């Protein structure tokens, strides 16, 4: 009987992190080092459960949770040159930097109270989600851990040679950097 109650779909909550804006504040050297925020990522957490419904969120599009992950150890760094069509080449037009293998963490973000939880998404159960989750929670009360994170960056090998059309040239070649 206890197992049926514990494993009931009424007790399960699915939480999905959703982006709600464009990442900002990218710092290349922070991505290659340690203990400095690499970028700012605005997100919200979408909670789903038969009782709280499908419109329950922690954070909103207008007031998101802002994550600022930072490397906890120095990542391994590698560079790969390739042509505009993606073929590896020592003298290619593009270079892709990979910073991999470091754990990343953020303990600085605040988390607002829940919204839209309950029947019809009207928020009748916001209080219950907040009570169970300890929300709202100030900066320093939350943590995000990313194990063996990877950060990638692609750029023109010699941006000066494409001047004054670096942006146009990069936009023609960017697809070759994707793997």
Where are these regions (language model features)?
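Extracytosolic secretory-pathway proteins
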Residues: 1-179
């Amino acid at each position: 009987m206890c197992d049926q109650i514990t494993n009931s779909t009424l007790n399960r909550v699915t939480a999905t992190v959703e982006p709600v804006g464009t990442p900002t504040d990218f710092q290349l050297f922070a991505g290659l080092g340690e203990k400095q925020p690499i970028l700012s990522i605005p997100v919200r957490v979408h909670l789903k459960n038969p009782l709280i419904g499908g419109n329950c969120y922690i954070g909103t599009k207008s007031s998101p949770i802002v994550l600022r992950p930072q490397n906890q150890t120095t990542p391994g760094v590698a560079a790969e040159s390739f042509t505009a069509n993606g073929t590896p080449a020592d003298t290619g037009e593009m270079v892709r930097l990979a910073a991999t293998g470091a754990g990343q963490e953020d303990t600085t973000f605040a988390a607002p109270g829940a919204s839209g939880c309950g029947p019809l998404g009207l928020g009748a159960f916001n209080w219950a989600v907040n009570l169970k989750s300890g929300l709202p929670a100030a900066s320093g009360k939350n943590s995000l851990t990313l194990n063996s994170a990877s950060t990638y960056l692609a750029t023109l090998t010699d941006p000066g040679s494409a001047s004054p059309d670096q942006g146009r040239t990069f936009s023609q070649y960017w697809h070759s950097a994707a793997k």
